[in-house]
Structure formats: structure tokens, C-alpha cells
Regions:
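Short, surface-exposed polybasic-aromatic patches that bind anionic ligands, especially phosphate groups
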Residues: 155
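Structured extramembrane domains adjacent to transmembrane segments
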Residues: 31-148
Length: 157
């Protein structure tokens, strides 16, 4: 038999409702940024029970951080599952205030070769990432070169 904890369902619904309302308010007020990233090399994925953490090279000195939840509401999860995050161009809208990422698209040709996907225990992943990257939020740019971020995390794990 399959049982549902009603309290957990209510809490999840409340959280998603609050986030949705914050995102709608930010959209109505016009507070958001359109982002675009042209990938030249494969992003790195750290897969965990609740989703996937993604690092991508943004520039020579910056790394893009995504924390993609395994949720139906986040289009990035389906793109990841279908292998479409290996496309050359990413575009998204990040709303101010709520920090919610919406309207994410991955376009263009696929990057050549294979990317790197690691499966990590969530506590292990978060401890290492927060230590190395300074507690980034979803969609943040980190002041660290991509290769340095990857190698440092891998060394810590």
C-alpha cells in the first residue's frame, strides 16, 4: 500500500504557493533579469536524491551554479533527464526578490563528447559545495574559474 503524509503535502503546497505568488509579484512589477549563456564546454552535474546540482563555465573567472530540484514545476529537470542540458545555448529569466528562475530554454546543437555526471550523497555534496563556493543560491554566478570549482569539489569529496 502507498500512504501519503497529509502534513507533508500541505507544507509542500504552502511552500510552492508562496514561491508562485512571489514570482508572480516580481513579474507584475517587472523586476527580473534575462540571462543567456553560450556553452563552449560541458557542464558538470552532481546528481543527488532531491535533484541535481549543475556547474557551468560562464566566463574565464566565473562559474554558473544551478540547484535543479527533481520537480515537475521546474522545466530544467526534464531537460536534464532528456539530455537537453547539453545544448549549446541556455536562456532563462531570474526574478528579483524571490530569486525564482523561470522560462528556462536550452537551444542549439548538442555539445560534442560526453559530460560528467557524479552521484553524491546529499550531505556530502552540500557540505563540499557550500565550503568551496560560499553557499550559492540557484542561478548565482560564483567568482571562481570553472575548472578550479570542479577540481576543488572533487578533491573534497
Amino acid at each position: 500500500a502507498w500512504y501519503i503524509n497529509r502534513a507533508q503535502i500541505r507544507e509542500a503546497y504552502t511552500r510552492s504557493t508562496i514561491q508562485r505568488k512571489q514570482a508572480q509579484a516580481a513579474l507584475r512589477s517587472g523586476r527580473g533579469e534575462q540571462w543567456s549563456l553560450q556553452l563552449k564546454e560541458h557542464p558538470v552535474f552532481y546528481d543527488y536524491e532531491g535533484g541535481v546540482i549543475c556547474l557551468a563555465k560562464s566566463s574565464d573567472t566565473k562559474t554558473l551554479f544551478f540547484d535543479i530540484p527533481a520537480a515537475r514545476e521546474d522545466s530544467r529537470w526534464y531537460l536534464y533527464m532528456n539530455g537537453d542540458l547539453y545544448r549549446k545555448k541556455w536562456e532563462w529569466l531570474k526574478l528579483h526578490g524571490s530569486g525564482v528562475l523561470t522560462e528556462f530554454f536550452a537551444n542549439g546543437d548538442r555539445l560534442m563528447g560526453k559530460g560528467h555526471i557524479f552521484y553524491l550523497d546529499i550531505s556530502e555534496a552540500w557540505d563540499a559545495i557550500h565550503l568551496v563556493l560560499g553557499a550559492p543560491q540557484d542561478g548565482d554566478l560564483i567568482d571562481m574559474p570553472f575548472e578550479e570549482a570542479k577540481k576543488t569539489i572533487e578533491r573534497l569529496l
